[in-house]
Each structure stands twice: as C-alpha cells, then as structure tokens.
Regions:
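Conserved, structured core segments of small domains
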Residues: 2-129
Length: 129
C-alpha cells in the first residue's frame, strides 16, 4: 500500500464511503450498496478517513444529505485494490476501490457527513467520531 496511513480502531482497518441517505436506506433493504460506479467503472469508490474530504469536496460540495459509512475492511468479500485517484489529488496518493457491492454487514457505523457553512468538507471531519 505504499506508505498509506490507515485508520485502525481496535485492530480493525477502517475504510469509508459516502452515499446519500436515500441510497443508504435502499442498501439496508437490499443488504448491499451498489452505487452507479459499480456498473459504470466496475468498482465502489472508498477512501481512508483522512482522504474522504477530497472526493467529498470534488463531488458533493454543499450537499447536506450525505452519510459517512465506516467500513471494517476485513468484512469485505470482494477485492479491494489501492489505485490512483484523479488528476488533482495529492502526489502519489492512492485510494481503495472495492470491486464488488458493499455489503451492509461490513458497515460498522453510519453518521451524517455535513459540510461547513461555506459548503466545504474539512480534512479532519471524518477522522473523528
């Protein structure tokens, strides 16, 4: 994983994913979260808690309906690959990509992920419970 700092809680590697409240409700009913990216590019975008502000600001600036899913990586049954993000992401940063649906059983907590008054998501927002 090339120097990636992972958020570990009680020997659990924690990854995170953002989705809307409605998408989370659907996932709870079906047992898995299947975002459009799974069909479009073959994987679910994940992040570390330290990275999640980057895609949040790029894709969801100002949105107030986001949920932060904290995921126990050991509970994922599909492969996770660490791959480059998009142009503009810092240097050699790689992101975890889940090559399959995100099982609800792998999600260990769900909290609202709200922006600051200016619509941006600060870098430290997801690193604290």
């Amino acid at each position: 994983m090339g120097g990636i700092a992972l958020n570990v809680v009680s020997d659990v590697v924690v990854l995170v994913h953002l989705c809307t409240r409605d998408d989370w409700r659907i996932a709870q009913q079906s047992g898995a979260h299947r975002p459009d990216s799974l069909d479009e590019i073959g994987f679910v975008h994940l992040s570390t808690p330290e990275q999640v502000h980057l895609p949040a600001n790029r894709l969801y600036s100002g949105r107030t309906d986001l949920m932060l899913l904290r995921i126990d990586a050991a509970r994922l049954s599909s492969p996770v690959r660490w791959e480059p993000g998009v142009p503009g992401d810092p240097g050699e940063m790689v992101f975890p990509h889940l090559y399959g649906a995100l099982p609800v059983a792998a999600v260990i907590s769900v909290t609202p992920y709200l922006p600051d008054a200016d619509g941006s998501f600060p870098a430290t927002r997801a690193t604290h419970d």
